[in-house]
Amino acid sequence: MAITAAQINELRKATGAGMLDCKKALEEVDGDMEQAVDYLRKKGLAAASKKAGRAATEGMVAAAVTANGNAGVLVEINSETDFVAKNDKFQDFVKQVADHVLQKNPANIEELMAQPFAGDASKTVQTLLNEAIAVIGENMQIRRFVSFSADGGAVGSYIHAGGKIGVLVEATCDKADVCSSEAFATVLKDVAMHTAAASPQFLCREDVSADVLEREKEIYRAKARETGKPDNIIEKIIGGQVNKFYGDICLLEQVYVKDTDKTVQQYIDASAKQLGCSITLKRFAKFVLGEGLEKKESDFAAEVAAAAGLK
């Protein structure tokens, strides 16, 4: 198949590889983007942490957590422009929706939109959205949300850069008085802050599927074979690389951003010892604003030409 410039550009953005390398990779795999990324990684030409993705759209991610910390939500609402995303009315609307989700616990977006709004039962959330669009003058979308409810623990959150990134974490604790303490809330916020910075894909290595692990091993094998190493040496090398892989993608095994002498698990264990309890991190969720959405881009040169009546 013919490889387009757009495909090459997308692969370059995803991997950081050179234009000719990207073109060759796409040709080798008949234009399959995911396979092209793997091809470049096997050749040592792409970073494992980079992923194909579209430019972010605008809007805001917000969190809401109950006063006692036993439940929390993360919500993303998109707008068309960054100008509106910084508007106080838009930000108030996002916070209202987050509070509603926390109170009413809808199962999905469809149920959320049909629910009577928690702040005014005479309106549905859909009506509230329509009114906000009319007042603010720009299209908006309630894109996604996630809800955590802690049994024998607490939920913590962290919002970065005014709503560009949001994280929700849940942990259990074997002492009720500690669960409701400010010190425990600080531990959760620290872990959430780390998650915002480090972008883990899984909580622990047990959560990594066999397929994902085998795919990584095959990439390591292919790269090692390029150096001419024998198979028995390759397998030993793979063992070390797999541990590094877990350290890159599993939250509990990542180097803790606020103390690089510890992993996140070691930070949690040290905090538990200090608080005189046992702490287990159960799950996390991370929203990056506009992740996976294609941003509407304008061609300034084309707009000028059109305005001048040129073609």
UniProtKB/Swiss-Prot annotation:
* GTP-binding in keyword set: no
Write down the CDD domains for this protein, in alphabetical order: UBA_EF-Ts
Q: Which domain of life is it from?
A: Bacteria
Which residues are in coiled coils?
A: none
Q: Name one GO cellular component term.
A: cytoplasm
Q: Which UniProt keywords apply?
A: Cytoplasm, Elongation factor, Protein biosynthesis
Q: Which NCBIfam families match?
A: tsf
Q: Which PANTHER family match?
A: ELONGATION FACTOR TS, ELONGATION FACTOR TS, MITOCHONDRIAL
Q: What is this protein called?
A: Elongation factor Ts
Gene for this protein? Answer: tsf
